Amino acid sequence: YKRQDQYHPMTDVIHKVLNDITVDDWAIIIGGDSHTRMSKGVAFGADSGTVALALATGEATMPVPESVKVTFTGSMADHMDFRDVVHATQSQMLKQFGDNVFQGRVIEVHIGTLLADQAFTFTDWTAEMKAKASICISEDATLIESLEIAKHRIQIMIDKGMENDDLMLHRLIGMAEKRIAQIRSGEKPALAPDANARYAAEVVVDLDLIDEPMIA
């Protein structure tokens, strides 16, 4: 046990911190925990040896998993929380397929208007479904807004004295600003699947079927 004032403000569970400072939707991220999931980019949990190798060499080798596409119909009722959508995805997937088609695969979430925190709620949950990784496909405007949120949170960390000698946090803000400019100019839109992308399975979640709060 340590006193609260011995920790920097904005210090948080590591996955949450990493999500707040992730500014590249095209990034491939690995971390030494199954809950290494982000709202931007695709993040894999890996064993400690793989993570150590990546830190030492900048490279890592792993098999490329199949993907499962998740789309949504209907609309959220006023009384619904986004966690209800997450739980409904699991419930309806199991009803549609009779088995966990997420296991060992990359879940590709198609709600283009999910801001960073909601997207992280979804991707982090996929670890509980034994998915290898997950990614949220964003619309350009939504991604820009999520990047602005990231810039704001990184600036708070800077203001609280959390910057290092290499000015990493300042450089992350610069990367976010560059990415926003690329999206606005059309030079590099938000990451999206190819038109001919193939999936191991396609799950359709009907939001209209969620008529009461759900718990895990």
Where in the sequence are the language-model features?
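Fe-S-dependent hydro-lyases/dehydratases of central metabolism
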Residues: K2-A216
